[in-house]
Amino acid sequence: MSDPRAVDPTARDIAEKLAPAYRTMLDAIAQVEPRIAEATRAELTDQRHSLKLIASENYASLPVLATMGTWFSDKYAEGTAGHRFYAGCQNVDTVETIAAEHACALFGAEHAYVQPHSGIDANLTAYWTILAHHIETPALSEFGARTVNDLTQVDWDTLRHRFNDQRAIGMSLDAGGHLTHGFRPNISGKMFDQRSYGTDPQTGLLDYDKVAELAREFKPLVIVAGYSAYPRRVNFAKMREIADEVGAVLMVDMAHFAGLVAGKVFTGDENPIPHAQVVTTTTHKSLRGPRGGMVLTTKDYADDVDRGCPMVLGGPLSHVMAAKAVALAEARTQTFRDYAQRVANNAKALAEGLMKRGVKLVTDGTDNHINLLDVTTSFGLTGRQAEAALLDAGVVTNRNSIPTDPNGAWYTSGIRIGTPALTSRGFGPDEFDQVAELIVTTLEATTPMTASTGKPGKAKYQIADGVAQKVHDAADELLGNFPLYPGLDLA
């Protein structure tokens, strides 16, 4: 296999061809609102000169970015391909069909719904797909109605009460779940009577026996599996066994690790597609596409999910669906599979680099793309302080709660870091070991400032003189060896 750190000549050729178009585009924007053109240029500069370690971020290819900037943005297309509420949607039908075909082929799914604008939209669509299939459709049959519009007011009130009487379980936020998995402040926590499962307090690992115990006791309609900050893989075959035992639907949110599924890093019991009836994902993150979402289902749920509009959504973002199709086509290549494997390998290298320097990691390592650092135990800092100090040094991360977090969900005790973005730039294990050194150097030089109570504060901090600039310079030198969008010169 060729050196993964070498610049792809095809990518450079594309960038050089697109550079004049981007320069012209920015000049045109500047004539209307120069501050937006300036911010766009500044964002590229910032991304080129920062160590992007946010696990949910990546770099989409220039063809994907270019696809979003077309007149597809102007077209309304409520409905699905061939069944629109607007005329003149034949080209949108083509785009949506191609994107869905790529999604099914890439993941081995029976059906794909590619309209959701985001991961949250995908999860909402999935929840209501399940409710429509298991609650609404049987009720319509019971009441002798074809659609909800045909119900009497009494029957409609009965159905609404049934909707509101359903149960779901998902991974708790501090254990690594997502806010859409039943977090009370989120709409998902208000839609369902909800309970959360966590992780083993000693190991930080998912305890399947505890999940099964909760499911038997609570008897949910939906069991949500998946995570946003859990640094290990999930056995979806076990989760399906639990769901089947209690008559629940298994819904998997693979937004964070979809790229590792697409790239064949997660296979067998770790691949959710053969085991879950409903799977949601974003199309960015590790999948490296545009910002958006998808729902993949078995054929039994196809008709229900295709009613995402008007059930949850309105008009799809046609220009983004087109970009999804391009990104999914890219993900079907061997180049992407090689990339996905490097993402996982690099995450292990980063974990080893951090642990050998004395950093405490939740679960003592990783086998996906995420590392979760306990910065309170390791450095006496809150996640908020560590996040801000690292940003001062040109290292972009996000604070994150850890299991039974003593600092709560706002200040947190952890930071979450991931390898997809820097792997896209060509970083390998040696570079990620250097990244570990830069992180530790920064945080060892950071101390909490005293609060008005006389105790160490949770927000303010100070970094030893010169350390932030030293780390920033070292990061910039490292990044210079792996240019972002090489050949894209906007000067």
Swiss-Prot record:
Subunit structure comment from the entry: Homodimer.
UniProt record similarity statement? Belongs to the SHMT family.
Q: Which pathway does the protein contribute to?
A: One-carbon metabolism; tetrahydrofolate interconversion; Amino-acid biosynthesis; glycine biosynthesis; glycine from L-serine: step 1/1
Which protein, by its recorded name, is this? Answer: Serine hydroxymethyltransferase
An MF annotation (GO) of this entry: glycine hydroxymethyltransferase activity
The cofactor(s) it depends on are: pyridoxal 5'-phosphate
Read off the CDD domains from this record: SHMT (cd00378)
N6-(pyridoxal phosphate)lysine is carried by which residues?
285
Originating species: Cutibacterium acnes (strain DSM 16379 / KPA171202)
User: Where does the record place it?
Assistant: Cytoplasm
List keywords of the entry alphabetically. Amino-acid biosynthesis, Cytoplasm, One-carbon metabolism, Pyridoxal phosphate, Transferase
Q: What class of enzyme is it?
A: transferase
